[in-house]
A protein has these predicted regions:
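Short, structured surface segments that line ligand/substrate-binding pockets
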Residues: 50-53, 59
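Extended polybasic, low-complexity segments that bind anionic RNA or targeting/receptor surfaces
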Residues: 1-50, 97-213
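Glycine/serine-rich anion-binding loops at beta->alpha junctions
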Residues: 58-95
Length: 213
């Protein structure tokens, strides 16, 4: 399928337009499907959910059920079989019991990629995707980025970068409600969690190239 293109404005750190970047309709202009987006989010949550503990009782561990000695006459304490909790390798008394086993949902790569496209398209519809020019990164400070967020009326933002820029990341990490991730880590859950998605010039190009393969 041939891709048509739409344009998204590229902004300087002062919030002013510095040009336009063409992005593929096949990624940023789909009609968002909530069912696909939810499927991918559920998969992400299942991958990162905490695995609860499960211990075996004396009835579940492997071992002989034969009584280890006579009940009386040995001079020692009375014991049952080797699966009792007092023996090494025996069952655990009153241990944690998870309700069912933790299972990670399976989702093929094609559906995960499609979910990413639909999540990005939903942000475009809400006018919540911004592209930040790479040219200003060498000298900008934390206050410059805070002002930029105010100009685009953003209360929280996901910054997706390509080339790791030490100045950029050091200044962004001090700002509340901002998360930065490398382009390769772009995911549906974070896109939906934050109000705005900020790409750098290079990161949106690289993401587009990857998703169109």
């Amino acid at each position: 399928r041939r891709s048509n293109y739409m344009k998204i404005k590229e902004l300087g750190i002062d919030g002013k337009d510095v040009g336009n970047i063409e992005v593929s309709d096949n990624i940023f202009s789909l009609k968002p499907r909530k069912d696909i987006i939810k499927m991918v989010v559920d998969w992400q949550i299942s991958r990162h959910s905490k695995k609860t503990g499960y211990t075996k009782t004396r009835g579940e561990v492997a071992g002989s059920r034969k009584k280890i000695g006579p009940q009386k006459g040995s001079g020692g304490a009375r014991h049952g079989n080797i699966t009792a909790p007092i023996f090494v390798g025996g069952g655990i008394a009153h241990g944690p019991k998870a309700k069912g086993k933790h299972r990670v949902k399976r989702l093929n790569k094609k559906v995960r990629k499609l979910g990413l496209k639909h999540a990005l398209s939903s942000k475009v519809l809400d006018n919540k995707i911004n592209i930040l020019s790479d040219k200003d990164f060498k000298n900008f400070k934390t206050k410059d980025f805070s002002k930029f967020l105010s100009k685009i009326n953003s209360k929280s933002a996901l910054l997706i970068y390509d080339n790791e820029n030490e100045v950029l990341l050091n200044n962004v990490k001090n700002i509340k409600n901002i998360k930065n991730i490398p382009e390769i880590g772009t995911n549906v859950y974070d896109i939906l969690k934050y109000q705005n998605v900020l790409f750098t010039h290079s990161s949106i190009k690289k993401l587009q190239e990857r998703l169109l393969k």
